[in-house]
């Protein structure tokens, strides 16, 4: 998988630089997200692993994407098809999002809770994480009933486990040692 990231990085960098230059980063992220989803389609995955000519593959891919891709997005697809790299579009999207987060000094923070959190709770978590990470944060909230109560917060390789499940697990570990 790291090979895909290595292959995807230059495409993501080129797309990001182009998007910044033309002030349409949101549009490019949407195009890449759509194209990445298309590659996950079972029929498209078969086409990508088949022996189609690059021009045919690019034309088919662009036809499936329809108006979701502008001319520049179509050009990226053509270049990637010529180089046999359409399979790495999900990794291109991931790298693009990473570059965007770095440029905007934002961090993706995943918050997992047993129940939906109130706006006030989300605001407190956002403020605390912005202070701790020294950057703006974007919360992605998930609900997982196995958490029982409390929250688990993940930001990059940092995990803050304030869940009842986590506390019970730590208590169990202490009692077993």
Swiss-Prot record:
| Superkingdom classification of source | Bacteria
User: What residue range is the signal peptide?
Assistant: none
Q: Annotated Gene Ontology MF terms? A: proton-transporting ATP synthase activity, rotational mechanism
Q: To which protein family does this belong?
A: Belongs to the ATPase delta chain family.
Subunit structure of this chain's protein: F-type ATPases have 2 components, F(1) - the catalytic core - and F(0) - the membrane proton channel. F(1) has five subunits: alpha(3), beta(3), gamma(1), delta(1), epsilon(1). F(0) has three main subunits: a(1), b(2) and c(10-14). The alpha and beta chains form an alternating ring which encloses part of the gamma chain. F(1) is attached to F(0) by a central stalk formed by the gamma and epsilon chains, while a peripheral stalk is formed by the delta and b chains.
Q: Which GO terms describe its cellular component?
A: plasma membrane; proton-transporting ATP synthase complex
Q: What is the species of this protein? A: Enterobacter sp. (strain 638)
Q: How does it sit in the membrane?
A: Peripheral membrane protein
What PANTHER family would the database entry show?
A: ATP SYNTHASE DELTA CHAIN (PTHR11910)
Q: What is this protein called?
A: ATP synthase subunit delta
Q: What does this protein do?
A: F(1)F(0) ATP synthase produces ATP from ADP in the presence of a proton or sodium gradient. F-type ATPases consist of two structural domains, F(1) containing the extramembraneous catalytic core and F(0) containing the membrane proton channel, linked together by a central stalk and a peripheral stalk. During catalysis, ATP synthesis in the catalytic domain of F(1) is coupled via a rotary mechanism of the central stalk subunits to proton translocation. This protein is part of the stalk that links CF(0) to CF(1). It either transmits conformational changes from CF(0) to CF(1) or is implicated in proton conduction.
Which controlled-vocabulary keywords does the entry list?
ATP synthesis, Cell inner membrane, Cell membrane, CF(1), Hydrogen ion transport, Ion transport, Membrane, Transport
**Where in the cell does this protein reside?**
Cell inner membrane
